[in-house]
Curated annotation (Swiss-Prot):
Protein's name according to its UniProt entry: tRNA dimethylallyltransferase
Organism for this UniProt entry: Mycobacteroides abscessus (strain ATCC 19977 / DSM 44196 / CCUG 20993 / CIP 104536 / JCM 13569 / NCTC 13031 / TMC 1543 / L948)
Stored SUPFAM superfamilies: P-loop containing nucleoside triphosphate hydrolases (SSF52540)
Residue numbers binding ATP: 9-16
Pfam families documented for this protein: IPPT (PF01715)
Length: 313
């Protein structure tokens, strides 16, 4: 069966454009690996490729959740693995694209996750809504100091997950960490990155464009559909900052600060992505700067040649 290709790397490096070019050349189908692009309606703030720009190519794992639902790596893994197996069985090439670190790792490698229980999780999510993330994190610290030490006091999603696992297993959270198995499909993993100064400029321009294209209106609409109740979606970079600005009155100053904080939060996230992906020796890193001269077409040609050689096709 066909060998998948994964296009990974930090935010704003041009992964989506490269994935489109690869899928078109190989007759492939695109599989999203960006956690926030799983959500319907979260389009501008996640830089989701508009349907009119998808070149008629099949896209999977986009717009599969309401903003009130919680995205989990385990659920994503189950659905995405089945999707890729189906694509391969039909003789097509899966082109995986995204920058959500654990989602990509759990997809490309055989991770086994501890049990989950929607009712238990819902109870802890309700507790989070009642007392706030700081107080809930303090409860985690009382139950499992080691877990609290590695989870940020502002990370409500991971705090809830830790408390859920502790309740279900009766063990410390660390004892229930995912078991990492072997690679699934011998995927060709391509990483795209830029020099830091240039990537910062791309992030700034993307952030400005988001706000110019109606990002605030998107958040306002999603709030009317329950975004505030979404444990995962409401904490996405950009969305959380705009929600706070709207709560502060939505004035020009508050929204300008939301824009600045979105930029800062994205840069911070890029550092985490680089650290995570940089540890994977399988990644073939390509310089995003080459897009400036040859466009995604030039990079795609190089990747396709490498893929054909390694796949003996």
């Amino acid at each position: 069966m066909t060998r998948p290709i994964a296009v990974i790397g930090p935010t704003a490096t041009g992964k989506s454009a490269l994935a489109l070019e690869l899928a078109e050349r190989l007759g492939g189908e695109i599989v999203n690996a960006d956690a926030m692009q799983l959500y319907r309606g979260m389009d501008i703030g996640t830089a989701k490729v508009p349907e009119c720009e998808r070149r008629g190519l099949v896209h999977h794992m986009l717009d599969v959740l309401d903003v009130t639902e919680t995205a989990t790596v385990a659920t994503y893994q189950e659905r995405a693995v089945a999707t890729i197996d189906d694509i391969r069985a039909r003789g097509h090439v899966p082109v995986i694209v995204g920058g959500s670190m654990m989602y990509i790792q759990a997809l490309l490698d055989d991770w086994a996750f501890p049990a989950t229980d929607p009712q238990v999780r819902a109870r802890w999510e309700e507790r989070l809504a009642q007392i706030g993330v700081t107080a809930l994190h303090a409860e985690l610290a009382a139950r499992d100091p080691a877990a609290a030490a590695i989870i940020l006091p502002t990370d409500g999603r991971r705090t809830v997950r830790a408390l859920e696992v502790i309740e279900l297993t009766g063990q410390p959270f660390a004892a229930s960490a995912p078991t990492i198995g072997p690679p699934r499909w011998d995927t060709l993993i391509v990483g795209l990155d830029w020099e830091t100064e240039k990537l910062d400029d791309r992030i700034a321009r993307r952030t400005d464009l988001m706000f110019e294209q109606g990002f605030v209106g998107e958040v306002e609409y999603l709030l009317s559909t329950g975004l505030r109740d979404g444990v995962t979606a409401s904490r996405a970079i950009g969305y959380a900052q705009v929600i706070a600005a709207l709560d502060a009155g939505g004035g020009a100053g508050a929204l300008a600060q939301a824009r600045d904080l979105t930029f800062v939060g994205t840069r911070r996230y890029v550092r985490r992505q680089r650290s995570w992906f940089g540890r994977d020796h399988r990644v073939v890193w390509l310089a995003g700067e080459s897009v400036e001269t040859g466009g995604p077409e030039g990079l795609a040609g190089e990747i396709v040649s490498r893929w054909r050689l390694s796949s003996n096709t």
